[in-house]
């Protein structure tokens, strides 16, 4: 990434440039399920989050009069080849040894592609959360999917872990306010 930013800084300034960087909402870390927007301080306690935050800073350092920098912080991607609802439904009637009270965030692959196009079409020059409207805990989401499918609910056995975790109700309002609409606003239904 350093070589890329160095090369881009040396390019001719006359030609406008639009950069789009895909980051992760995981940079927010454990916010205990609190509503979280782009203004929230990033969690640099976990090494992965620290690397992601440094990458965002490096890309943002390229911003200038001739360079627009758009950063999208993505939720967990689902869609073709990554059927998250089916994975969650596989827990039906079983025991899940994870913390079902964490609030993850999601985005469909189709909306990722559309958002990148939107960034280029509208010359976006800011940071946006690219997540759909689903703001359920892992257990709530799994329960809802099981109920819709007529399957028995999973039993959750919460274990403490030192793994990297996202536990935040990540807001997508800033992106919606500039006119982006989601084709898949929810992972449910």
Task: Cite the ranges covered by each PLM segment.
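Conserved Rossmann-fold NAD(P)-dependent oxidoreductase catalytic core, especially the SDR/UDP-sugar
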Residues: 5-47
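Active-site beta-alpha turn of Rossmann-fold NAD(P)-dependent dehydrogenases/reductases
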Residues: 20-23, 73-75, 131
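Conserved sequence/active-site signature of Rossmann-fold short-chain dehydrogenase/reductase
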Residues: 27, 77-79, 112
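Catalytic helix-loop patch of NAD(P)-dependent Rossmann-fold dehydrogenases
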Residues: 32-71
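NAD(P)-dependent short-chain dehydrogenase/reductase
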Residues: 60-104
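Alpha-helical substrate-binding/gating segment
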Residues: 86-95, 101-128
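Mid/C-terminal beta-alpha module of Rossmann-like enzyme folds, strongest
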Residues: 113-166, 171
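Amphipathic terminal alpha-helices
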Residues: 186-189
